[in-house]
Amino acid sequence: MFFVMDPVFLSEITVELVKHSASDSDVVFSARVSTLGSFVAVTDCLSNRDIGLITFLMRERHGSPFEHSHMTFRISAPIFVFREFMRHRIASYNEESGRYKNLDPVFYIPDEKRKLVQIGAPGAYKFEEGTSEQYGLLIEEMKELSLAAYDTYKRLLACGIAREVARMILPLNLYSTMYVTINARSLMNFLSVRTSRANSAFHSYPQREIELCADRIEEIWKGLMPETHAAFEKQGRVAP
């Protein structure tokens, strides 16, 4: 087995827009076909009436017109983030395979902004800052165990053990990469539960790492569909 990369520890999650067919006008012409049939004029120039229609659809939760806008993202994040992401069975996923390639030694470690201490019972808890001693211990242990696991992974592969078996030794903070294709309606559902906002009609308490991922996705989507995003915000971030 051939390994060319030294171990790397990161505290970042990266999101890149690969391609899209997503605009506010997609919502408008998809909705208006209901009443105008084949006479719908497709244009990227929105009138005030068009913007009002988007707001109406969002408020009244007429969701299907929002399904005609699609985005594909390339995301690099630790495996535990992807396991939460894929609970949303409303997107298409293809992930880097540990069966078919050697996995790179890139590991996630929390930065110092990460709150470490859980206070309260499940369903009614909050997180507070940890001490410098707690943070130091966490990082020391994570790095030590990550390196030990990866060394074992390499030894298993060198002994002829299959990738799909050897990978079982690797920890959840290992980075992976996946492509996600999702429509705007499904994306709003994802954002409604994976972000925490003061104006949300239904408050959510996402894990910090998946919220970082969601924040980056939302910023990209907002640039593609600003009027749809504004309507989403106005209606308390409830998916239609």
Curated annotation (Swiss-Prot):
Catalytic activity: dUMP + (6R)-5,10-methylene-5,6,7,8-tetrahydrofolate + NADPH + H(+) = dTMP + (6S)-5,6,7,8-tetrahydrofolate + NADP(+)
Domain ThyX: 13-235
Pathways involved: Pyrimidine metabolism; dTTP biosynthesis
GO biological process entries: dTMP biosynthetic process; dTTP biosynthetic process; methylation
Gene3D superfamilies (alphabetical): 3.30.1360.170
Residues forming the catalytic site: R194 (involved in ionization of n3 of dump, leading to its activation)
Assembly information from the UniProt record: Homotetramer.
UniProt-recorded name of the protein: Flavin-dependent thymidylate synthase
Organism: Tropheryma whipplei (strain TW08/27)
Source taxonomy: Bacteria, Bacillati, Actinomycetota, Actinomycetes, Micrococcales
